[in-house]
């Protein structure tokens, strides 16, 4: 659920930046609200990645998406919407995230991840820590009785399913933007993915928006260019392009 939430937020934010730049609105949307126009927009789901940019590329922070990571979004939703829905005081809810990355422990302590002194997520367990706890408790999953899946906020979509693989966030965000602008799903054959020669961990993709809904007519014919990388070598190369103003991506 929260992966879908992140995808919708990031996709909508990217669309807002494209609108502001291509419609010549400058730093405000049609309602006069401020809009970050920095392109390319960079995903903000990894706390380790955020820390790297803060230290190595502090002048490029405007390029980061304003979106929280999925598990901190979920924590915020649980302590607001879910708390209200169930009649529970937010202070009586304790949110624990099970994550594969130890940097998530640091992430939940950042000041951006709390409101009025209330953390979005109270604790993080790594998957390895959870596995140890399961073994210590002697839980035998093979012989546990069947139970119903608990989905208090609904199920996820296919876009959320690919979220965890390299490039999954980008593909999901592109799908969202394309569907918002055209009213149709993104045909996979229209997504042209190209590896960068000599750097296998970086790949680029482009999609040309051929037809649009009336309100997005200014995006007709626009080709959106994106890049995906795994590892800091490729990421640093892309960030250097951003820093020197030669990045061709959105």
Predicted regions and their residues:
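Iron-sulfur-associated redox domains of electron-transfer enzymes in respiratory
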Residues: 1-250
């Amino acid at each position: 659920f929260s992966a879908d939430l992140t995808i919708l937020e990031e996709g909508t934010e990217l669309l807002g930046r494209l609108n502001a730049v291509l419609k010549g609105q400058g730093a405000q949307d049609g309602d006069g609200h401020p809009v970050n126009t920095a392109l390319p927009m960079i995903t903000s789901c990894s706390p380790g990645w955020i820390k790297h940019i803060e230290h190595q590329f502090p002048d490029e922070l405007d390029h980061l998406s304003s979106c929280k990571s999925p598990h901190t979004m979920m924590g915020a939703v649980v302590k607001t919407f879910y708390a209200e829905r169930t009649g529970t005081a937010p202070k009586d809810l304790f949110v624990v995230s099970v994550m594969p990355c130890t940097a998530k422990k640091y992430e939940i302590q950042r000041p951006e991840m709390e409101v009025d002194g209330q953390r979005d997520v109270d604790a993080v367990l790594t998957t390895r820590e959870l596995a140890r706890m399961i073994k210590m408790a002697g839980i035998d999953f093979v012989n546990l009785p069947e139970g119903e899946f608990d989905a208090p906020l609904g199920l996820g979509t296919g876009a959320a399913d690919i979220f965890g693989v390299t490039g999954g966030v980008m593909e999901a965000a592109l799908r969202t933007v394309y569907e918002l602008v055209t009213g149709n799903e993104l045909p996979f054959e229209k997504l042209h993915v190209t590896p960068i020669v000599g750097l296998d961990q970086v790949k680029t993709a482009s999609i040309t928006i051929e037809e649009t809904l009336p309100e997005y007519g200014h995006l007709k014919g626009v080709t959106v260019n994106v890049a995906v990388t795994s590892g800091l070598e490729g990421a640093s190369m892309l960030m250097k392009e951003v820093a020197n103003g030669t990045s061709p991506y959105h």
